[in-house]
């Protein structure tokens, strides 16, 4: 939501693609729409918007992706497109300041700590096959 505000202020045209299990789970749709952001909804059961997942509801044309969510969704999303992107990873964090190395992800630059080096990484630097 905050990123959409910044993109709009910079004269960009963001599209928010939001995925949920059911129509009852949908949130933030009205907030994005109030900003003037085109908002696309996908629900796994088809009760609202596109039936399926976020990757099934992607616009045909876009320049870049900025995504957050569960690792399986992020993997599928990044595998589907060759567009550049920024990915915010979720990880269980034992200490929260990088000492325990419990939240590492494998990248083209070696192991990185999600809590200290991230949580945002470029889509291209994440070694997706090595992620949980």
Each model region followed by its residue ranges:
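Short Fe-S-cluster ligation motifs
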Residues: 28, 34, 106-132
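FNR/FR-type flavoprotein reductase catalytic core
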Residues: 1-89
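Nucleotide-activated chemistry modules centered on ATP-dependent adenylation/adenylyltransferase
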Residues: 58, 74-76, 88, 97-98, ...
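Local cysteine-cluster metal-coordination motifs and their immediate loop/turn environment
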Residues: 1-2, 71-72, 90-119
């Amino acid at each position: 939501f905050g990123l959409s505000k910044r993109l709009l202020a910079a004269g960009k045209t963001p599209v928010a693609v939001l995925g949920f299990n059911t129509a009852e789970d949908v949130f933030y749709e009205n907030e994005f729409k109030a900003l003037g952001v085109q908002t696309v909804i996908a629900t796994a059961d088809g009760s609202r918007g596109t039936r399926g997942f976020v990757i099934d509801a992607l616009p045909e044309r876009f320049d870049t992706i900025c995504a957050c969510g569960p690792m399986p969704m992020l993997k599928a999303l990044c595998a589907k497109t060759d567009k550049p992107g920024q990915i915010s990873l979720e990880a269980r964090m034992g200490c929260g300041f990088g000492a325990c190395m419990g939240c590492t992800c494998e990248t083209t630059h070696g192991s990185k700590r999600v809590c200290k080096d991230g949580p945002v990484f470029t889509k291209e630097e994440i070694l997706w096959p090595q992620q949980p």
